[in-house]
Every structure is written in C-alpha cells, then in structure tokens.
Amino acid sequence: TTAASEESWTLTVATSAGEAEMLATLERLIDERKADGFILPRTGTHDARMRLLRSLNVPFVLYGRVADPEGCAWYDILGEEAMREAVLRLVSHGHRRIGFINGGMEYNFSGLREEGFRQGMADAGLDLQADLMLSGAMTREAGSALTRRLLSHDAPPTAIVFAVDAAALGAYEAAEALGLEIGADVSIISYDGIPEGAWVRPPLTTFSVDSRVAGKRLAELLIRRIRGEAPEDLRETATASLQVGGSDGPPAATSETIVLRVNAARAGTVT
C-alpha cells in the first residue's frame, strides 16, 4: 500500500470463495471501472484470472509465474532454487533418503518447487524415490496426514522437504504421534517463513520470503504496466533467505530405526 500511496494510487483487496466468484468479481470491477489494474497472487499453472484479464487487455501483474507467459508481467520468488538448496543442506548433514511433500499441483509454484527438489537430488547424486514424493498439502492437517504416510513407509525418509510452511507445521504432531522427534529422528526444511514456524519446538528451518518487499515491487510494477510499459519488460524474480531453526540436522536415526520406533509407538497405542 505504501508504494501505491506514494504514486497517489489506491489499493483495494478483493477476495472470493472460489474461482467462479473471483472471475465474476473481476468482471464487475472492470465493467464498473473501479480498477485500473490487478495484482494476482498465488497463480495457477493455467490461471483463469490471468486468461480473463489478458483477453480483455486489462493491466495486471502476477505474484508468481504461469505456464503460458505471453502478455504477463510478474514478480516471483525462486522457490525452485530454495528447494534445491534445501536438499543440498540436508545432504550436507548426512541425509541420503529424503522425502518431498508438495503443495497443490494446481498452483504453478508446486511444479517449480518439484523441479527444484529433483534438481537438488540430481546435484547430490541421489536417486529419486517416487513413493517418497507426495503432493496436495496446503494446510497443517494435510501436512500431518502426508507426513504420517511417509514415516509409515517400509523404508521411511530421515528428512523431508516441504513446499509450504503450513504443511510442515503438521509434521510436528505427526512425528509426535509416531514416537519421533523433529530435528533429531526426522529433519524437515520448508518454505515461506510464516511467523508460526518460530513458535513450534524446535523452530522450523525455512526459506523466508520478504512479503513487504514483494508487495512494494508488485505495486510498482503494476503502476508501470498501467502507464503502458510492455509486460515483457516487467518481469522480476528474487531469492528466498534461509532462516535456520532447529528442525534440521544430522540424522540421529536410520530409516530402519524409524520403522522400529513407529511400530513401537503404534503397539503402545493399541495396548
């Protein structure tokens, strides 16, 4: 809002309950001439909002990227590079069996972050294990469920990379329920830098995004787009910063040890 105010522009936030409602809201704002341009966050791979605005030749800037970049301006964080670095950090600790819990595949960032994870594994000379790569976790509850699934594997990972912090927070309760400790028995690294990551114990190691800088750049890019600059000249990326917590470190348990502890925890629950 500060960047917009400095240029005497007003920023209005519009929310909706779903895609159809959001598209209707965009069309209404355009028809009523209540907006000169739009910032579109959390972009889909084939974003319907982007397609609508592009077809109507209405200025917009994406907070993210899309599969078809024609006519698109954007600001985005290189989440794929963060995922690659997360893998290499875990490998430097001594981990060799590393799982991946991604976000919803409808979002473009999920595909990019999976690419980054794959690249990190390749750079480390490690084979990908498809059954240790899961997706669809955008919430704490989903993260907990998928963490339980990975840690209940016949040969579970000793470390897990999460595409989003919200899902990573669910790993704490999942690990506890299975008789494991995050940061010791299982290492995790995530991405987003949400405040809640500092409240868990041990604090979450994550790649942090400066939301204030992102908001400022998005507003500045949109104003330039409204003033007629070509979208191809308004494409910026930045990197996330590693925020070290206590959730990752050298493996204190092997995959085999994790199996034994999980089985013991389940037996204890039954009895």
Task: Tell what function each PLM region has.
Residues 146-271:
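Flexible loop/turn connectors
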Residues 8-10, 59, 96-97, 127, ...:
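Residue-level detector of anion-binding/catalytic polar loops
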Residues 34-41, 99-101, 133-134, 154-164, ...:
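Periplasmic-binding protein-like
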Residues 1-88, 152, 270-271:
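Alpha-helical recognition/docking segments in bacterial nutrient-uptake
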Residues 13-22, 75-85, 101-146, 161-170, ...:
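Hinge/beta->alpha junction and helix N-cap segments in small-molecule ligand-binding domains
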